[in-house]
């Protein structure tokens, strides 16, 4: 089997990708048997290509799966941890803008009654 390109895999359905993955795994096992029994050098060099192809197929499967999950959870209140934006621990624990601006009743009354003083600087 020739080297597989990821862009060709992206157009395929999941069933086709899984079938191709099985075919590649069978081919890899045959190549490994050939390696043990002393196969040709061309077969030995093909092991690497097949391994990389398996990795490509798995990568495309996982990426499409994650993309579908992102679409499903778009606009929902709660998302799985791996779909949330990756930030530092400190940033995740920071107060939101709304939480920062919240005031107690006493503070609201005080700010309403005593507004901020404005001073004019004489030049």
Swiss-Prot record:
<dbReference type="InterPro" id="IPR045059">
    <property type="entry name" value="Ribosomal_uL29_euk"/>
</dbReference>
<dbReference type="GO" id="GO:0000463">
    <property type="term" value="P:maturation of LSU-rRNA from tricistronic rRNA transcript (SSU-rRNA, 5.8S rRNA, LSU-rRNA)"/>
</dbReference>
<dbReference type="GO" id="GO:0043009">
    <property type="term" value="P:chordate embryonic development"/>
</dbReference>
<dbReference type="InterPro" id="IPR001854">
    <property type="entry name" value="Ribosomal_uL29"/>
</dbReference>
<dbReference type="InterPro" id="IPR036049">
    <property type="entry name" value="Ribosomal_uL29_sf"/>
</dbReference>
<comment type="function">
    <text>Component of the large ribosomal subunit. The ribosome is a large ribonucleoprotein complex responsible for the synthesis of proteins in the cell. Plays an essential role in early embryonic development. May act as a haploinsufficient tumor suppressor.</text>
</comment>
<dbReference type="GO" id="GO:0003735">
    <property type="term" value="F:structural constituent of ribosome"/>
</dbReference>
<keyword id="KW-0687">Ribonucleoprotein</keyword>
<keyword id="KW-0043">Tumor suppressor</keyword>
<keyword id="KW-0963">Cytoplasm</keyword>
<dbReference type="InterPro" id="IPR018254">
    <property type="entry name" value="Ribosomal_uL29_CS"/>
</dbReference>
<keyword id="KW-0689">Ribosomal protein</keyword>
<protein>
    <recommendedName>
        <fullName>Large ribosomal subunit protein uL29</fullName>
    </recommendedName>
</protein>
<keyword id="KW-0217">Developmental protein</keyword>
<dbReference type="Pfam" id="PF00831">
    <property type="entry name" value="Ribosomal_L29"/>
</dbReference>
<dbReference type="GO" id="GO:0022625">
    <property type="term" value="C:cytosolic large ribosomal subunit"/>
</dbReference>
<dbReference type="GO" id="GO:0030218">
    <property type="term" value="P:erythrocyte differentiation"/>
</dbReference>
<dbReference type="GO" id="GO:0051726">
    <property type="term" value="P:regulation of cell cycle"/>
</dbReference>
<dbReference type="GO" id="GO:0006412">
    <property type="term" value="P:translation"/>
</dbReference>
<dbReference type="GO" id="GO:0003729">
    <property type="term" value="F:mRNA binding"/>
</dbReference>
<comment type="subunit">
    <text>Component of the large ribosomal subunit.</text>
</comment>
<comment type="similarity">
    <text>Belongs to the universal ribosomal protein uL29 family.</text>
</comment>
